[in-house]
Amino acid sequence: GSRGFKPRAADERVGYFVTNYTDLGKFDWADTSQRLINRWHIEKADPKLSMSPPKEPIVYYIDHTVPIRYRRYVKQGIEYWNEAFREIGIDGAIQVQYQDKTTGANMDKDPEDVRYNFIRWISNDIATAIGPSRVNPMTGEILDADVVLTDGWIRVFTYRWEDLLSNLATEGMSPETMGWLDANPKWDPRLRLAPPSRREQILVERAQQRAHDSHSGHGVNHDSSMMIGENRFDGLGGRASQVNGMCEAATGKALDLAMMRMSLSMVRLLETAAEMGDDPEMSEEMLEMIRKQLAENPALRDMIPAEQLAMLEKAVDEDEADDAEDDGEEVAVKKKDEGDMIDGVPEWFVGPMLAELVAHEVGHTIGLRHNFKGSSAHSLEEINSEEMKGVKPWSTSVMDYNGINIRMPGSGETQGDYSVIGIGEYDQWAIEYGYGSGDLKEILSRSADPLLAYGTDEDAFGPDPRTRRYDLSENPLDYAKNQMELVKKIRAGLINDFVQDGDSWSRARRGYSITLSTQMQSLSMMGNWVGSAYVSRSKKGDPDSKAPIEVVPVERQRAALQFVIDNAFEDEAYGITPELLAHATVDKWWDNYSSISSDSAFQIHDRVMGMQASALTMLLNPQTVSRVYDYEMFVPADEDALTVAELLNTVNESVWSELKDGGKGTYTLRKPMISSLRRNLQREHLDRLIDMSMDNGGFNSASMAVKTIASMDLRDLKKTIDGSLKSGSLDGYTKAHLQEASVRIEKALDADYIYNAEDMAGGGGMTIIFGQEGKDRP
């Protein structure tokens, strides 16, 4: 290590990787574990100066493999951190040099040499970025660090969207939940969202994994990875010095970039409308662009405020009238200058996104851990305002997996920055603690400031919904609604706008799959808010600090619950049309085995059922239900709170809403009372309700409450179903569905005692019904 380096103690209020050891010279258990933050030896060349260059800067070399078109954004992302070091009086703490094959500059430096810190670039089809480091295990001093970037997140259309769906569906689930899903695979989104041909293989792999892990399927248990990068918790446990073993920031960027590619024309039109103000004067080039986009995608009209739409259409109509009066002389129309395109994406979009990604990974190399609360500081109205746009980052930390900001009408007055444009308040504070020379206790005492909130990887499966990957805004419900509006508009233009002449129709299926991923991301994001509580890391005595656990206001939980219901359970949420299904196909190539095994026709029922089943799991899994049950006691009895009964009843009423009118009306097999998608949902929900009515111990302390409420709901549901069956106007599909549901409920309620109920996952135990033996559980 460096001469004169002084180790610095770690503190849970600020996120650094740590080097830890056990001091057996201490006899107080709280003192035996010693933790030091991982940091570079950076100090002023002249301590007497308020602003001084460093004695020895951190130098990063941009590898010659980084494409020239991206190099300036890579450099920009690295240098973002100099702002934080200037705040503590060190100017130029980080320096950047290019390695260039043409000029020979720095080509004598080997990226594998530990004396040099490199930003490396790899071309592949995987969205990856990582910032590992080498640390002195005695002191926590960082000795060497590198960043590895791939361009896979830019090459987004080769992504396996099925895999991403299951990852998004289980985002935020705890080790206990993942272990429970392992024992109850029919509830498991990872299985339900997988292609049917792969499900048996997944179960076999899961069984092998259970032999090694206490909470199978959750990465926090994988301490023994042979190589870092196998799961998201690599580098954190089972080692003296933590490192960034895996980072998924680029994975979110892949989905964001895919959505941007699909919505590019829409975004341009919305920006044009927003920038018009009271001045309808536009160039010929602009008018031609607007005319073309409105003709190709009429759904765009619904997205523009009425006053601005009227101005746009008036300007286009007047221009067309002028053309009609022309003597026949053709007017050459020059395409609007939209700036340079890089790999099919506007430079003004992908450039800042890359700079943010680089800043995130460089943050890891200077010791910082993830902070998933960074994006929760500001509302969408603030983010999409002139006061913030281009002036300050809308996230307090580049160490978050920040979502992308594509503004839809009603989400602010103007389109704000799409990406985070620099380090935030938390980042500056973290550098002040790790590298500054001020009073460390005073620095840490500011932790209760909302702009300095911190939550990291192990918090992301806890009860705090703000510690969330890929979300955005102080109220993520607004962001989720914004994303679903974007999804609807993109789906409306899939056939006529996204798939161009000469394109394969497989683009329609890929495009639709991308929108499903964004939909799942929004559902999972809001599912985390049901049964949630804010968690604070502040300590007693910190100014303005709150209780460490604060139940999320019931209004927010109910709004989140309703969002999941509206956007997962209703047919309209999926934007399915006969035209879409007729065109959503696949290409058949032997170099892409997944396409060879895929059906040319989209298996829409299976895909939607996977989405709906996953949403039910988000709301009704034991961890969520138990938290709702526990949090009832956190709230005084004279105050409103979400209850287990309300949660189950709300889901029940929404899933079976068709029964409210008792089957009145006229129905046919082609226009049934209950659609095919909703029949699948209702059968799935009935399975869950029966499971919950037969206590298998999975719901812990809430088991008896869940059992009794679920049994009551089953009795009420049977009465409603039987009443609807008396209607003589039911179609054949609905009648058969309801008859089967009624019989299943009756058999379930007849069960007086379940033998071996706690082992239902083993294929279903024998059910001993009073007066009946040997009947299989329904």
Range-by-range predicted roles:
Residues 76-82, 140, 356-371:
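Active-site recognition of the HExxH zinc-binding catalytic motif
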Residues 72, 131, 156-161, 408-415:
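Short conserved micro-motifs at the rims of enzyme active sites and ligand-binding pockets
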Residues 65-93:
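Zn2+-dependent metallopeptidase catalytic core
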Residues 1-66, 84, 88, 99-325, ...:
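Auxiliary tRNA-acceptor-end handling modules of aminoacyl-tRNA synthetases
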Residues 348-356:
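Active-site alpha-helix of zinc metalloproteases
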Residues 55-57, 116, 363-365, 394-396:
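Active-site lining segments that contact anionic ligands and/or coordinate catalytic metals
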Residues 223, 242-349, 374-778:
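Conserved catalytic/binding loops enriched for acidic/polar residues
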